[in-house]
UniProtKB/Swiss-Prot annotation:
Pathway annotation from the record: Metabolic intermediate biosynthesis; acetyl-CoA biosynthesis; acetyl-CoA from acetate: step 1/2
Membrane-spanning intervals of the chain: none
Protein name (Swiss-Prot/TrEMBL): Acetate kinase
Biological source species: Thermosynechococcus vestitus (strain NIES-2133 / IAM M-273 / BP-1)
Function: Catalyzes the formation of acetyl phosphate from acetate and ATP. Can also catalyze the reverse reaction.
Family, as annotated: Belongs to the acetokinase family.
Cofactor binding note of this UniProt entry: Mg(2+). Can also accept Mn(2+).
Length: 415
């Protein structure tokens, strides 16, 4: 058995999970096990105070951690405190951190050079740093997580698993923007994101449908605060809605998705700065911007119940954006065997699933209202007679990263 620690390091939070698995499980396991331990550090409200939460099968622990400086020094101390809960106290699972066989990291942007998980070395770190220009909110935090873990567990190998890797085989017509080609060759192209999630749920969908993934044409819908849709043909991503950055595509919680680029030129001419435009498209738009209420769909639905017309408009725009996004992926597939919903909204908002599917009846989509509203777990919520399956699948990105680590360890090490 191997012990895998999975880290998802962000700019204001860090999530971690611990799994034990046999090396060959990466290629054979279908239904993911629950993590043995889950940890969270959240310093989003105050850069000098982190909220620590740890959960195991039968224990839960919370604490507030403070550091006078915050920043990297604070995170280093907080991460050590988080990992201490693995080796001491009521959540203890390990005698020492040396029992961790391998550490897997989610990395948002791998550009065009990383099409599979890789062992982290100096060259990989340098590349992730270079790609920070493409993902300034994510890659630096991902890289910092690697650096800190190298200090804490210097003998433990680390693996980078890239969110862009699943989309690395996008055909040229899907990844190329209609801009001068020298810009394309300079790296400005559609990369796609949420790939770890899209790949996992497409594989899980094939298991639920009891059909080979190689013969399925699926659209996977990762709907959370960030949203993206992907056309998966025979297990390969052939089109996706996010692009050069995670700002593109469908309407999201705070991101605008696709808009006329002339809007940004117009605002630049009116004196807006690049930083202001960045905040506009990434933090002030989407459901939050249109509703004026929140990026949280639950609060928008509550506002709708209170008769707020702006909240209703935001919801309607969101549903329409997703319907249009789904339809836009059909040419890449030719036919549709299954529509897959995942992530926070996709898994937990039956009303959203219902309203999206209401506009897609022409595709052969017919929901079983009972399965949609009251069903639990991974399931098919389409009517048995419907020609297109509609699946709800709980995304398991941490497990997918752990599995990738297991697969990498089972490969022979080249000299």
């Amino acid at each position: 058995m191997i012990t895998v620690l999975v880290l998802n390091a962000g700019s204001s939070s860090l999530k971690a999970s611990l799994y034990r698995l046999a090396p060959e499980i990466g290629a054979t396991a279908v239904r993911p096990p629950a993590p043995l331990w889950q940890g969270l550090l959240d310093w989003g409200q105050n850069p000098t105070v982190a909220r620590l939460k740890v959960t195991t099968a039968n224990q839960h622990y919370e604490a507030n951690l403070t550091h006078p400086e915050g920043g990297i020094a604070g995170l280093r101390d907080w991460l050590k405190s988080l990992l201490d809960t693995l080796t001491s106290g009521q959540t203890k699972l390990l005698e020492n951190l040396a029992e961790i066989t391998i550490i897997g990291h989610r990395v948002v942007h791998g550009g065009s050079r990383y099409q599979a998980p890789v062992r982290v070395d100096a060259q990989v770190k340098a590349a992730i740093s270079e790609l920070s220009e493409y993902a300034p909110l994510h890659n630096p935090a991902n890289l910092l997580g690697m650096e800190l873990m190298a200090d804490i567990c210097p003998q433990t190998p680390q693996v980078a698993v890239f969110d862009t890797a699943f989309h690395a085989q996008l055909p040229a017509v899907a990844r190329t923007y209609a801009i001068p080609y020298e810009l394309t060759t300079a790296g400005i192209q559609r990369y796609g994101f949420h790939g770890i999630s899209h790949q996992y749920v497409s594989e899980r969908a094939a298991t639920l449908l009891q059909r080979p993934l190689a013969e399925l044409h699926l659209i996977t819908c990762h709907l959370g605060n960030g949203c993206s849709l992907t056309a998966v043909k025979g297990g390969v991503s052939v089109e996706t809605t996010m692009g050069f950055t995670p700002t593109a595509g469908v309407m999201m919680g705070t991101r605008c998705g696709d808009i006329d680029p002339g809007i940004l030129l117009y605002l630049l001419r009116r004196g807006w700065t690049v930083a202001e435009l960045d905040r506009l498209v990434n933090r002030q738009s989407g459901l939050l911007g249109v509703s004026g209420v929140s990026n949280d769909l639950r609060q928008i639905l509550a506002a709708i119940d209170q008769g707020n017309p702006q909240a209703q408009l935001a919801y309607d725009c969101f549903i329409y954006s997703l319907q249009r996004g789904i339809a836009s992926l059909l040419p890449a597939l030719g036919r549709l065997d299954g529509l897959v919903f995942t992530a926070g909204i996709g898994e937990n908002a039956p009303g959203v699933r219902r309203d999206i599917c209401r506009g897609l009846g022409w595709l052969g989509i017919e929901l079983d209202s009972t399965a949609n509203e009251k069903g639990q777990g991974d399931r098919n919520i389409a009517l048995p007679t419907a020609p297109v399956s509609v699946l709800v699948v709980q995304t398991q990105e941490d497990w997918a990263i752990a599995r990738a680590c297991g697969q990498l360890l089972s490969l022979p090490i080249s000299s």
